[in-house]
């Protein structure tokens, strides 16, 4: 009997021998979702059971060095990525407001969320070197089932709190960034085009996240998307994501945020007048479709006129006439990375410290950088 504890300890040592001591289970979950791979698929690649992969990801057991080598190959990440390094905060899927929830496969949404988690981690790393805008979003007290009037009032209060008293919002994305929101645009390559913009205010890092679609190559649509996600951030913390009611509320918020009723109602035409709609489009930075919908919602366009306008818009398709230029781009993440480099810590140094592949780090930083051409003067 006295030898029993010794035998148990010896058996435990034998089982743990050859296992990776500094394995980070969170990083496995992130890498697997980035690769758009299920646990069962990964299990087949590395010749273990799906239950074993689940145990790895939940930190119940660690993979052997052989299993980790297979994981690294299957997911296209170096071994070092799966070892403890920079903490990658979690964004729970239940808190992420996807506009395309019903049309996007769950694994593709998980892939986009994993990219957002990496972006939050990179921003956290950069914040060790430079000061970033603190989170300064207003608190809006709304009832559990707010009316259209309540939502409109909330959008007006949000404009004032964010420093937009009247007129068009100059740059919605920069406004979000200035108030501490991390905004990034998903890479066009490797991600499902059906993944639309989404947001979450309930991140482990405490910084709100907005991911924009790379395919909305239009300024008007990107501005509305960003305003829609702002509505989620301000109105839907703790609210179950994905319902039609919640999405409709965010749409109403965005419409009032970009086109305040008190300022635009009298200027909206009472008939299908495309010249007037185009002038309003240029002034307010919104799409013709959004203006037509707003005119009908506010009672300026009758049902028959609204129907005629929508038939014409459908005939034109996308992009609609009168483009406003390229979409609004985020800039904080890219600009902060440049400041870090100016202070002597290049991206390669950051990548090594964070145990994130340099190529992956470049992709994340690029997602938060304006791609406007820069003037360089050489001698």
Model-predicted segments: where are they?
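Active-site hotspot residues in diverse enzymes, especially metal/ion-binding acidic/histidine motifs
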Residues: 1-379
């Amino acid at each position: 009997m006295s030898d029993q504890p010794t035998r148990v300890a010896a058996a435990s040592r034998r089982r743990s021998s050859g296992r990776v001591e500094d394995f980070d289970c969170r990083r496995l979950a992130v890498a697997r979702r980035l690769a758009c791979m299920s646990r069962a698929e990964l299990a087949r690649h590395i010749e273990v059971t799906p239950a074993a992969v689940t145990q790895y990801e939940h930190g119940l057991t660690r993979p052997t060095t052989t299993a980790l080598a297979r994981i690294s190959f299957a997911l296209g990440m170096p071994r070092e990525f799966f070892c403890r390094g920079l903490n990658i905060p979690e964004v729970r899927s239940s808190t992420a407001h996807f506009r395309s929830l019903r049309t996007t496969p769950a694994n593709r949404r998980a892939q986009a969320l994993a990219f957002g988690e990496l972006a939050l981690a990179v921003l956290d790393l950069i914040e060790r070197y430079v000061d970033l805008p603190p989170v300064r979003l207003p608190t809006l007290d709304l009832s559990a089932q707010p009316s259209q009037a309540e939502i409109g009032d909330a959008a007006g209060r949000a404009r004032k709190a964010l420093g937009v008293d009247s007129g068009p919002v100059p740059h919605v994305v920069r406004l979000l960034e200035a108030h501490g929101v991390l905004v990034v645009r998903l890479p066009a390559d490797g991600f499902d085009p059906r993944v639309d913009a989404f947001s979450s205010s309930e991140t482990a890092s405490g910084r709100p996240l907005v991911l924009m679609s790379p395919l909305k190559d239009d300024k008007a649509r990107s501005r509305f998307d960003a305003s829609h996600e702002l509505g989620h951030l301000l109105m839907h913390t703790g609210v179950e994501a994905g319902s039609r009611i919640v999405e409709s509320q965010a749409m109403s918020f965005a419409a009032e945020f970009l086109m305040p009723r008190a300022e635009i109602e009298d200027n909206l035409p009472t008939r299908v007048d495309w010249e007037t709609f185009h002038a309003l489009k240029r002034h307010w930075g919104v799409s013709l479709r959004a203006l037509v919908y707003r005119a009908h919602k506010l009672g300026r366009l009758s049902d028959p006129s609204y129907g005629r306008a929508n038939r014409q818009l459908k005939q034109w398709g996308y992009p609609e006439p009168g483009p406003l230029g390229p979409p609004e781009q985020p800039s904080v993440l890219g600009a902060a990375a440049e400041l870090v480099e100016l202070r002597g810590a290049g991206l390669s140094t950051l990548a090594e410290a964070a145990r994130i592949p340099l190529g992956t780090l470049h992709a994340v930083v690029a997602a938060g950088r304006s791609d406007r051409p820069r003037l360089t003067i050489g001698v």
